[in-house]
Amino acid sequence: MIVPFEHVLILAGILFALGLVCVLVWRMNLIMLLIGIEVMLNAAMLAFVGGAARWGMADGQVFSLVIMALTSAEVSLALAMVVYLHRRKRTVDADEFSELKG
């Protein structure tokens, strides 16, 4: 059974909206900010894969692989920064990044 393309887009829109709410509501907590960005990127990836399946083109699937590589690099760098901030300041508040130097 194939899922209709409209359902895929609705699910991707709901996921993107949830990620956006997470980013907007918890923008001071860096962990929640990262989770929200990841959910939004996964929603975009779902829309690309759904579109690729709908029109029979591999471009959306290739672009989803690019998004996966981008998100893995983004998460590894951001989590390293969060761990550094937590060790130095004992908090994961986004405002504390402005006080770090070096």
From Swiss-Prot:
It comes from the Bacteria. NDH-1 is composed of 14 different subunits. Subunits NuoA, H, J, K, L, M, N constitute the membrane sector of the complex. Belongs to the complex I subunit 4L family. It is found in: Cell inner membrane. The gene is nuoK1. This is NADH-quinone oxidoreductase subunit K 1. GO terms for biological process: ATP synthesis coupled electron transport. Gene3D superfamilies: 1.10.287.3510. It comes from Geobacter metallireducens (strain ATCC 53774 / DSM 7210 / GS-15).
